[in-house]
Amino acid sequence: MAEGFVSFGLEKLWDLLSRESERLQGIDEQLDGLKRQLRSLQSLLKDADAKKHGSDRVRNFLEDVKDLVFDAEDIIESYVLNKLRGEGKGVKKHVRRLARFLTDRHKVASDIEGITKRISEVIGEMQSFGIQQIIDGGRSLSLQERQRVQREIRQTYPDSSESDLVGVEQSVTELVCHLVENDVHQVVSIAGMGGIGKTTLARQVFHHDLVRRHFDGFAWVCVSQQFTQKHVWQRILQELQPHDGEILQMDEYTIQGKLFQLLETGRYLVVLDDVWKKEDWDRIKAVFPRKRGWKMLLTSRNEGVGIHADPTCLTFRASILNPEESWKLCERIVFPRRDETEVRLDEEMEAMGKEMVTHCGGLPLAVKALGGLLANKHTVPEWKRVSDNIGSQIVGGSCLDDNSLNSVYRILSLSYEDLPTHLKHCFLHLAHYPEDSKIYTQDLFNYWAAEGIYDGSTIQDSGEYYLEELVRRNLVIADNRYLISEFKIKNCQMHDMMREVCLSKAKEENFLQIIKDPTCTSTINAQSPSRSRRLSIHSGKAFHILGHKRNAKVRSLIVSRFEEDFWIRSASVFHNLTLLRVLDLSWVKFEGGKLPCSIGGLIHLRYLRLYGAVVSHLPSTMRNLKLLLYLNLSVHNEDLIHVPNVLKEMIELRYLSIPVKMDDKTKLELGDLVNLEYLYGFSTQHTSVTDLLRMTKLRNLTVSLSERYNFKTLSSSLRELRNLETLYVLFSRKTYMVDHMGEFVLDHFIHLKELGLVVRMSKIPDQHQFPPHLVHIFLFYCGMEEDPMPILEKLHHLKSVQLRYKAFVGRRMVCSKDGFTQLCALDISKQSELEDWIVEEGSMPCLRTLTIHDCEKLKELPDGLKYITSLKELKIEGMKREWKEKLVPGGEDYYKVQHIPDVQFINCDQ
């Protein structure tokens, strides 16, 4: 494995030497010597990797080599970047630049000679130890070849909803009955070891038709080992009142009072997933009243947690799969599209498969991981190699004991070992994130690019390919996954046991350090600080270590959000972190609101994230960050922030998020950022709309227009952005009450799938003015006087429509027969003038979810909903009590919704 990491590093180093050959002229002799030693080194790696398991000495050799490759890359890139920074005009600058150039060239030549000598010494030691040269004529797949293969295997995605049901059908039925029909138990607990399927079982119950009809509202919160009381309460309240935008600003006591009152008056189901200790419940319980309106479904590895929460608790012990169920689940993952009519699996392979699943101990997680591993193997010899790898080190069984648990971890480890090197890198980078973190994929893809896993020009596509492969192998869990082209994986997570494997492998490869408490020496010094080039900080108490000299070689620093405040008070905090490629300071508070000027010294940075950070002033030294691919400036600032006009120098940027609130002095020139793919917060108050003309690679754009502009100007500036997939247009508060839709023409954007308009318009544009393949449309504050539905229902690719905040100010709205042929989701919120809504039979035949929120004058639910048999979920929020009384069983309008499995009433008691 280490050989793969070293080879990966060598490949990046060769690319750097080739790419910067012109700027490296003058040190040819030193570089030639380095290249000779690198070639010799590469020929030793395969034999070293084969021998590393039996020798600590060989493992140390490989660690030394990895450090040397990193050091060489740092030296060469620093030289190139300093040379770029020195380029300028004027005689004095030229003289100073020449003197500095000669000094730098002498230093880099000396440094390269030093690295070359160290490599030569390691090679000599390796050869003396008996490591042989192996000249490998093969080659690794190029990025394009990997993507081609990935496109082929994407068609065989397993149906997780189907596979998850293996062996749990009866358990789901029993749990549903206890929650819906039995009032004796306030708390129902699912207990069992990690990986046994507690969360899967709870999820099936949570979404069951009878459960969705029985309760008024639902909340799902993952508690995990490290949590904060406020965060758990906040999440519950957000799920029960999803449209309350003030929850994030509430203090702990306000949340507690509001949540207590809510649970006291309604019939709600709250799922607390992964509660570890009795004490965890004691920290959470204050919001749950004694009155029996709510019910709780709780999952835990500790059977005593549920009984501690409620002495009358019903404890359900999750059971392992039997051998037949294990093989059935494995088959569904290995052959997701095989049906009864197809040729049976080779008998020898089936026999091996059934033998291998016995080593999974009946744990669904291990069975899925094994299935993901075997899905890439198509011959008897390949299956036999997997079987031998499992059987050679463990002896499994069908019951859970220490031995079979070892076999489970062995199978999970084999799934990792089977990954190609680039995917091993992707997987290990997930170790940065705290337990049960929701990982946003757009940030993750840019993070992978900043770490050099793939070329910066293909960030989104490459990231999607790699993540889908990790999901397909059941190493990562994808949330909101849809197997249709217009949807993307929005976020992902890791199962606890898989995360343990990830952390173990990261430690084994000296890949990163996780720092939870700097007073704990074992946390910091578990490995040599000089070799830990990635730090992940999970505690605000760890501040003082950031600028320590022993971290001078750190390349990645990620600060995770935690309960206590994290302050940066030292202006020199970045002085000893000059080799950073990745820096995530989300939610960090900077003293005086100033980002330290020393950040300008981080010239290697590719990724800088300040999301939610308390910052009101950015330094002009940021102009030095010329290699940035990703820059997120979505800071949390109550005051206006000043952004110096330095972003124009970051021409490598692919992702840019600009602060929403900037002072009037901020004027930005962004026209040279031609590599941008994602641009958020673009405002014509601070930037010229014509800057967009050359950004032809843009895929996602959010633009705010001031009173100086109209749609004609905007359309002209967007005309070349033919790769746009998502576009949001907002007019400033001063001007959105003026009709600007006369020149609205977006029909030439053939790739545009998502459109959001916060624009005043008396009527919606004609259907021919819209993009031809539009899938999602969001209309806010439009003030349309004419019914938009006759136009929208003719956009035949639409799958979701949101009308919010007086998008329509008329009284009557009609969805006609044969309209909205593909619509899946409809949200009608805060349409304060709407009185009558007609849905004709044959309209919206594919609708699955419908939300009606705070439409105070709407008289009743449309009668035509009774014809929409596809409807699975109806959310009614903030409507009068009469609505609820009419629509519950026995109510006069119940016939309209009796076919809908999940009908929720939220805040409908006024």
Curated annotation (Swiss-Prot):
The keyword ATP-binding applies. The keyword Glycoprotein does not apply. Residues 15-57 form a coiled coil. Gene3D superfamilies: 1.20.5.4130, Helical domain of apoptotic protease-activating factors, P-loop containing nucleotide triphosphate hydrolases, Ribonuclease Inhibitor, Winged helix-like DNA-binding domain superfamily/Winged helix DNA-binding domain. Keywords: ATP-binding, Coiled coil, Hypersensitive response, Nucleotide-binding, Plant defense, Repeat. GO terms for biological process: plant-type hypersensitive response. ATP binds at G192, M193, G194, G195, I196, G197, K198, T199. GO terms for molecular function: ADP binding; ATP binding. Residues 146-459 form the NB-ARC domain. InterPro entries: Apaf_helical (IPR042197), LRR_dom_sf (IPR032675), LRR_R13L4/SHOC2-like (IPR055414), NB-ARC (IPR002182), P-loop_NTPase (IPR027417), RX-like_CC (IPR038005), Rx_N (IPR041118), WH-like_DNA-bd_sf (IPR036388). Belongs to the disease resistance NB-LRR family. RPP8/HRT subfamily. PANTHER family: DISEASE RESISTANCE PROTEIN RGA3, PLANT BROAD-SPECTRUM MILDEW RESISTANCE PROTEIN RPW8. Disease resistance protein. Resistance proteins guard the plant against pathogens that contain an appropriate avirulence protein via an indirect interaction with this avirulence protein. That triggers a defense system including the hypersensitive response, which restricts the pathogen growth. In contrast to RPP8, it does not specifically recognize the Emco5 avirulence protein from Hyaloperonospora parasitica. This is Disease resistance protein RPH8A. It comes from Arabidopsis thaliana (Mouse-ear cress).
